Amino acid sequence: MSAQDKLIKAQHLIDMNDIIREGNPTLRAVAKEVEFPLSDDDIILGEKMMQFLKHSQDPVMGEKLGLRAGVGLAAPQIDVSKRIIAVLVPNPEDSEGNPPKEAYSMEEVLYNPKIVSHSVQDAALADGEGCLSVDRVVEGYVVRHARVTVEYYDKHNEKHRIKLKGYNAIVVQHEIDHINGVLFYDRINAKKPFEAKEGMLILE
């Protein structure tokens, strides 16, 4: 039984045991493009990946399943070398603690996503990045593009082109790196991890 066959079983909930860790060769491989029209298996896998992210962000389900909270997941992280990513970025509460009008600033499963253009300006998260496949802290600025235009297909086989900036752009670039065999710490300057290039946007 392949990893995907196990993951898409109706009763299976993706948990931390399904997520492979650094050192596994799947994380360093360039993943294969999915074929269209999408197979039921690839659609279900995308839905399961999104379900995992929602569970991971839910305090009750997250604790029950022992999950680390995540805003993105790529198929290679669950040992399926396909170009599928799921992104779920929640909107914050307002200053008075009220829930946002829209729960998420981005909620999408992207098939065969690719960056088709990007800004000259770079950006990095002030606190660095983490990864569900990396069980250690690696400090430093992860240098990425401040703005990107991404093309992808959705589960209905429809093509989209979206422009992203800020945190959403960072998250999508992190996940696209996964399908290209790249891990976030590859983009940290090992000798000067917190060196900010001139004009680089630091996102708090």
Swiss-Prot record:
Gene3D superfamilies: Peptide deformylase. InterPro entries: Peptide_deformylase (IPR023635), Peptide_deformylase_sf (IPR036821). Its EC number is 3.5.1.88. GO terms for biological process: co-translational protein modification; translation. It is an enzyme of class 3 (hydrolase). Binds 1 Fe(2+) ion. Fe cation binds at C131, H174, H178. One of its GO terms (molecular function) is metal ion binding. It comes from the Bacteria. The active site is at E175. This is Peptide deformylase. It comes from Streptococcus equi subsp. zooepidemicus (strain H70).
